[in-house]
């Protein structure tokens, strides 16, 4: 089980990222617009830098929904490989069966 503080920190990053997503997109589209003058684009870069770091979507960590484990998380299920193997072994994941040949 992961530390509760790291799970909470990741949740707050998700919330900040969602709330400032549109503002970041608008600033980035203006920054990459070649029709705007260089000085104005530089001021837009500075305003983007003033936004909180945790509002960036790249700072969000993919974590297991059950344990909070940060590594080995499958995108399809949102569960770490260990828990996924355990649940599949018990037959609790619909549509997935353990293969044998």
From Swiss-Prot:
Q: What's the short name of a Pfam family annotated to this entry?
A: Ribosomal_S14
Annotated region Disordered: where?
1-22
**Which biological process terms from the Gene Ontology are attached to this UniProt entry?**
translation
Spans traversing the lipid bilayer: none
Gene Ontology cellular-component terms listed: cytoplasm; small ribosomal subunit
Q: Which Gene3D superfamilies match?
A: 1.10.287.1480
Q: Which PROSITE patterns match?
A: RIBOSOMAL_S14 (PS00527)
**What are this entry's molecular-function GO terms?**
rRNA binding; structural constituent of ribosome
Q: InterPro entries this protein is in?
A: Ribosomal_uS14 (IPR001209), Ribosomal_uS14_bac/plastid (IPR023036), Ribosomal_uS14_CS (IPR018271)
Lineage: superkingdom:
Bacteria
Composition bias, Basic residues: 11-22
* Summary of subunit composition and partner proteins: Part of the 30S ribosomal subunit. Contacts proteins S3 and S10.
Q: Which HAMAP family match?
A: Ribosomal_uS14_1
User: Belongs to which family?
Assistant: Belongs to the universal ribosomal protein uS14 family.
| Function description | Binds 16S rRNA, required for the assembly of 30S particles and may also be responsible for determining the conformation of the 16S rRNA at the A site.
The identity of this protein, by name, is: Small ribosomal subunit protein uS14
Q: What is the lineage of its organism?
A: Bacteria, Pseudomonadati, Pseudomonadota, Alphaproteobacteria, Rickettsiales
